[in-house]
Amino acid sequence: MRKQLTIAALFVTVLMSPMIPVSADNPEIDYGNGSTVFSWSGTANTVELIGEWNWSEVTTLTENSGNWFAELNLDEGIYCYKFIVDGAYIFDPNNPYRGFCDDIENSVVRVKNSSRPNFASELSNDNLIITYLPGISGAMPDGTPIGLESATWDSTAMTWTLDTTTLADGKHTLKLEINDSDGNQAYDHLVPFWVGEQSEFTWEDSLIYMIMTDRFINGNTSNDGPPTGAAAGADWMGGDIEGVTQKIESGYFADLGVNVLWLTPFNTNAQGTGIAADGVHDVSAYHGYWPIEPREVDPRLGTADQLKEMVDAAHSAGIRVMMDYVVNHVHEDHTYYQENPEWFNQGCICGTENCDWTEHRLDCQFTSYMPDVNWKVREASEQFIEDALWWLEEFDLDGARIDAVKHVDDLAATNLATRINERFETVGTDYYLKGETAMGWSGDSLEDNQFQYDTINRYIGEDSLDGQADFVLYHAVVDNVFTQGARNYHHLDYWTSRSQDQYVPGAVMVPYVGSHDVPRIASRADVGTNDAYNQWQEQGLPGQPGTDGTYQTVLQAYGWLLTTPGAPLLYYGDEYGEYGGADPDNRHMYRDSSNWNYREAGLFENISALGQLRLDSIALKQGVYATRYASPDLLIYDMTHEQQTMSIILNRGQATTHDDFDSNDLVRFGDATISSSTISIPANSVTVIEQNAVTAPPP
């Protein structure tokens, strides 16, 4: 999220179900008189305001040069409202926060208590400036907030100024708390920021590594749970948070060029098993998407302290950590469902007769034991947002992947993004929100795919998600071009280019070739087999590929992925070519290097070299994609940044040459050679060239 919002904020307490509040920031309150200010800009004859504070009373706004204002004295709370512009009811265009009152969607204002002080903050030229905003009484602060002891206090400006160059490199998160001299407690204020090299990071710089925690590293066997009786491949296997920490500290992710970790949900999940979608096999909740507790780390993954230690280790290594947050559903044993069944839809089962996935996307249940959250219920939507804020704050996380976005009301994404922006982006540190809006690819025509793009775009914007998984690109090219070879590199180039011009400007999309929801790319690329989509042991599952061609295909795919725009996703194990069929067989336990064969070790060496190159190259991270040459089996494109240009050559055919380079260009990856203007390109190869990298010798 990129825009700092200034909407009124609420310190919420919901009486129907006790809510653990996390205050939002930046209220539009006039602390001179404690009023809440509503404003609208534009040309109109009349502008009025109506709201939940008194639906029977309409307030007329006062106009001044096209700007309309009204001030109301409202008690602390949360209120639906709308403007009435020349008789038409409209949302507040300056306030993205929404909610339902009497089943009608409205803008929502969150009003704080004006007697309580607030803080404002900015980071400028390495100086952190904290401004104290007194409550309506004007009382001054009683002391200095923890974390600002070394800051300089200016009583006239009511600011503390902290020189951040005196702090250690890395991430710092200040939680500012204070009382005023009258004893009024200020609303706490969170200030996350990075010092040193990492302060220059943008999310376009990411190489995201997805970890299914239970299937990664078993770092502590004492927290392993007992078998649940699930089908083979669908039970807990012992991976845990300590295992992730060990891998961070080993330097493994640094070797890969990985600077972001996305881990599956941390919440305590259901005990026992549930029936899989096939109606036959029992599966457990090892994956994390069947939560039963809102704010508890699953003991089979570790403890809260171990999660904090893992995040600290990641930050020390320059790695950001994203949580996976489930907004669409819970397991039927969840505390909220047991205590507040009215928070959930009583819908049909998605995909069954008369229950189309699209038509009933907002109210159908994925399974009978997964109640569907009704985001139209204010108490439910506010609580799920509060829980998300709690996880991000309690464990100092850096962003989130939002599960099943298109299956919840639009306000889920906008409200969550707004509150995260208010709470965490107080000095411009960007918290990345990545969505999952599962779509497909509908054929070669751009027109035929417009619905796919539009649906994904629906949830992206300044007041919503920062980006999403690029489902259209995945379905257009990964099997069509790489694993099956039915389409050529003209096709690859075309759909790569469409990902640059079909999404919301500024979106940071996540291209991928493998994930926890699809069969492993190595098995899909294993020519001559037909078991890549099998799931269960009795069906016959894919084995370890035994030909060089499979690993060459995986390298072609990852060579493309790691050198195109966006924040590419590396699914755990793909770096060495882990094999497997459909879920759950695509979630094998991670194998360390002692269990790789020479082909797997070679693939890891190449992918880690590409990851390192991407990490070090401003052009590969932030450059603009442009086609240089395309033929059925050879694609050459540039990634251009004002500081650097990198050229990438993907060749899935025989050895060839190309005359379009310069003797000052330098091969950064691959075995190609440049002589004068001609480059010799090996068969089945990936090449990365830095243009004008060789400085001519002095005369």
Could you say what each language-model-derived stretch is?
Residues 27, 319, 387-389, 393-398, ...:
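Active-site-proximal helices and loops of the catalytic beta/alpha 8
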Residues 80-81, 676-698:
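C-terminal beta-strand-rich structural cap/linker in extracellular carbohydrate-active enzymes
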Residues 74-78, 164-171:
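Surface-exposed, short loops/turns at beta-strand junctions within beta-sandwich domains
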Residues 202, 216-395, 412-426, 432-437, ...:
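Substrate-binding/active-site clefts of carbohydrate-active enzymes
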Residues 88, 179-184:
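Short, solvent-exposed loop/turn segments at the edges of extracellular beta-sandwich modules
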Residues 28-78, 84-112, 143-156:
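Aromatic-rich carbohydrate-binding modules that target alpha-glucans
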Residues 8-18:
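Bacterial N-terminal signal peptides
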